[in-house]
Amino acid sequence: MSIRLKVANTAKELDDVFKLRHEVFIQERGKFSSKDIDPLRIVDHFDTLPDVANVVAYEDNKAIAAMRINRDSQIGLPAEEYFDFSDIRSHLKQKYLDSKGQGPNIVSASMLAIHKDWRNKKNVIFSLFKTAAGVMYSWDATHVVAAISEETLSLYGRIGFEVIDKPMWSESVGDTLLPILAPFNKVFDWTFGSINTKVSHFWLDNFCSEFERLILSPGEVIFSQYEPARHAYAVDNGWVSISRRDPESNEMLLANLSKGALFGEVAIFNGESRDATATALMNTELIVIERSHMLDIIRQNPDKLDQLLGHFARRIRETDNLAMVLAFAPQTGRVEVALSRLWDSATPDRRKPKTRVAKVGPQQLAKTAQVRETEVRRVLEMKKAKGCLNYGDNVVRFLRPPKTGDFTEALKESPV
């Protein structure tokens, strides 16, 4: 079943967040010793401030994880209830005034609550952090502070946080806490670094705070042909197939999309139903943009239309080039193009960073290139013999970048 992450906006969603905190912190973990706590919810005065956002993850209709983000205010940040950040604040303020002529914009992360059934599933935890980072980006954050449980330090360390003082036992929380700090550019690079070069800044700059996220298992349908269009999507991790059925129910694969690919946005603007079906091919994480948010931004900022037209111009050019490949390229050329696109979306091997790995096999490549699987295997065997790659039934390991022929190189330039 899919998991959806979003910023809580309704009374019901906020109540789900407050109840989840109580379930996790008090019922499951025995934290927060105060007798004054609500018997069903955990809420404090930082939840009442103007610049606060709560990110919540849902499986079906059940809240399974949540995190709060606060923008700096006259009463400080939640982390400062437990630690003195005044020296850090003074240092950052002087540094930013000297270099930029204005002070830093500090935000705080707090109240990380994850249901026990999901606590060891890092895809949910990291997706929660990524959704929160989208809000921080829209707030022009420069630094993030937090007071965290000592046992969660390894999670925050991966994102770019560093410990800035000794741990301290908090009687009111019933836990050992650590003060941590991260420059937001590190958090942003962790969140959007690899996708930032593939998705137009039009989407990041205008919709970042409205991004939802969707975590899918293999075979889950994102949307179906003929259904109304309510969202646009970008692939953050994984693969998505786009297919269409004709009146006789014959299925045609239109594309396999990987990291950085934007899809579903055309139907958002023309108001028509979907003309294809989108399906997750493997464990996949998507960034989701709701139709009403997108249209509101365009109505409020007509100057954004230039950026939007630029995006659609690039999409048309890519479609023209792909049509040229499918119409005129020999089967070998089609496989070369498919491999080139696969290289762009493959991820570096952790042990050998110069090697890239894509969890896609010959059968899926054949569907993408619209050729026989035997032809794909023939090309793969030739490249394997030359030391370019290794492959299996469900994986391709690139040992070096693929070289494309003159035909595919020519397609990089649009004829119009």
For each predicted feature, which ranges?
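Short acidic-glycine-tyrosine-enriched beta hairpin
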Residues: E248-F263
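Short, His- and charge-rich active-site/binding loops that engage polyanionic ligands
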Residues: V56, D60-L92
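Short amphipathic alpha-helix that is part of the acyltransferase structural core
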Residues: M1-V43, L49-Y58, A63-I64, K198-W203, ...
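Phosphate-/nucleic-acid-contacting segments
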Residues: T142, A147-S149, G157-P183, V187, ...
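Regulatory nucleotide-sensing modules
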Residues: N196-E248
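A small-molecule sensor/coupling module
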Residues: L128, S273-D275, H293-G333
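Acyl-donor binding region in acyl/amide transferases
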Residues: A79-V163, P167, G174-L181
